[in-house]
Amino acid sequence: DLGGGVDGSGAGSEAAQSVVAEIEALGGEAIANGANVARYDEVEAMVKQAMDKWGRVDILVNNAGILRDKSFAKGELDDFKLVLDVHLMGSVNCTKACWDIMRDQGYGRIVVTTSSSGLYGNFGQTNYGSAKMGVIGMMNTLVQEGGKYDIRVNALAPTAGTRMTEGLIPEEAFALLTPETVTPAVLYMVSENAPNKTIICAGAGAYSIAKIVETDGVWLQPEDQTPEGIAANWDAITSPEGERQPEAGFEQTVKFTGKAMEGLGLVDK
């Protein structure tokens, strides 16, 4: 925890040091490090500090974040880039610094922090939502590249009352949305029996899974492959019947070419 403000300004070690004190009071070991996750050199030094102390990195939780909330019309591009740098590139930097370590040791558990603002949208958070969906794309590909090394990558979409959300959530709801109700989801996602490529949503003691699915769709005859043809077949294109969650991007290509070959009579249905 860099200990800065919600907007990313300033820095301080108090927040991180208080967590270290809690861990040590329970008999554990911990190090506080105020690295700026947007700077790869600082992240590398942070990971080296952990390796020098413990000799392994088994778990990485990418959770650094800031807010620069404004409507897209009023927001500044510099703020947009800063939010991407911390949320998205911060996750990239930390994961990159740990990736080879996890590959070499044949084990790793990584969590990226996404958000309902990215999954579903939230007014005034175009920058934040973009970054939070960026880490989902990152997760989807890292799962494929890390599989043979037993590196599992999952995403957490938390709803919690924290320093960053204080003042944004009504007081009664804030009292229910304690970070402690999110912690069990994180711990499961970094356990030895963790799932893979899963988006878990957590808050106030409630838990759910978010999924990206694709409808089965339809193949249109060449003469119907027009905007008008799309409109005329919209119900079939959007029908949830037969929708599924692809395991990899190439499955879309296989599905579409298969439908085209069937439609053109090049293969038997």
List the model feature ranges, each with a label:
Residues T95, A131:
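Active-site helix of classical SDR
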Residues S71-F72, E76-K81:
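Substrate-binding pocket helix/loop in short-chain dehydrogenase/reductase
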Residues L26-E29, Q49-N62, R68, E76, ...:
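A glycine-rich helix->loop->beta "capping" turn
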Residues S115:
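Residue(s) in the substrate-gating loop at a strand-loop-helix junction
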Residues I101, Y120, I136, T141-I151, ...:
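Active-site-adjacent segment of SDR/Rossmann-fold oxidoreductases
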Residues A155, A173-L266:
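C-terminal helical subdomain
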Residues S13-E14, G34-A45, L77:
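The beta1-alpha1 cofactor-binding region of Rossmann-like NAD(H)/NADP(H)-dependent oxidoreductases
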